[in-house]
């Protein structure tokens, strides 16, 4: 019996809108080189920065893979992988799919559940036992075979946003995407305009947008209070 794994292909378009004048000036930059994770930092809750417990993040067949095959039990070992550079105005595109079955000991809500953390906290400032980075999460979900389960939703670990002119303090809000069952690849793009507009796009369709990402609220454990200063706008990560 396999455990769920997540396959990722990542690339990023550096918009730098303040400096560029024409869309034709934009060029895709491939973040993941298809060979190794030398440009990335791993942070797993309960472990020091850089310790890739259980070889969670790995490269197989030219793809970035998140696997729990070496876990006896998942527990609360929430893991994140951070690129070496920060960006402020950009489009990030990812193609993902889920394969296998849920890791033993994993929470029910975490089944076929991953995400892209936008404007994420510098992992150097995360505590050893912090579960999630302070960030804006573009939640990536896979269907469960029945019922609705959209993807590219918004979740807010230690953050809030403004939606339809009002401060949103709920932890997660669904996008308008359809449900993607099975193990087919899904393409997600996120347009990020500094601390103003963020837009979620799935297979070419805009499914959610909001403004003014900022630190606030809960839904993140063991964060350093010197870092989690509520009300501060998030402009890069």
Predicted regions and their residues:
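Carbohydrate-interacting regions of secretory-pathway proteins
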Residues: 20-237
């Amino acid at each position: 019996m396999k455990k769920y794994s997540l396959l990722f292909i990542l690339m990023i378009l550096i918009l730098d809108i303040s400096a560029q004048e024409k869309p034709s000036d934009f060029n895709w930059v491939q973040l993941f080189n298809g060979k190794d994770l030398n440009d990335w930092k791993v942070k797993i809750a309960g472990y020091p920065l850089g310790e890739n417990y259980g070889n969670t993040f790995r490269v197989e067949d030219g793809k970035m893979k998140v696997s729990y095959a070496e876990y006896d039990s998942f527990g609360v070992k929430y893991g994140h992988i951070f690129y070496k550079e920060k960006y402020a105005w950009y489009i990030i595109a990812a193609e993902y799919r889920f394969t296998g079955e849920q890791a033993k000991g994993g929470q029910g809500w975490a089944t076929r559940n991953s995400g892209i953390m936008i404007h994420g906290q510098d992992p150097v400032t995360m505590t050893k036992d912090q579960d999630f980075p302070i960030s804006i999460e573009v939640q990536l979900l896979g269907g469960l075979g029945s019922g609705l389960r959209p993807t590219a939703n918004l979740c807010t670990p230690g953050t809030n946003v403004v939606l339809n002119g009002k401060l949103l303090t709920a932890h997660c809000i669904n996008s308008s995407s359809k449900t993607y069952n099975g193990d087919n690849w899904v393409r997600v793009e996120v347009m990020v305009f500094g601390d103003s507009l963020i837009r979620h796009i799935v297979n070419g369709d805009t499914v959610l947008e909001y403004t003014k990402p900022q630190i606030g609220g809960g839904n993140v454990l063991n964060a350093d209070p010197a870092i989690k200063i509520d009300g501060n706008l998030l402009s890069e990560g």
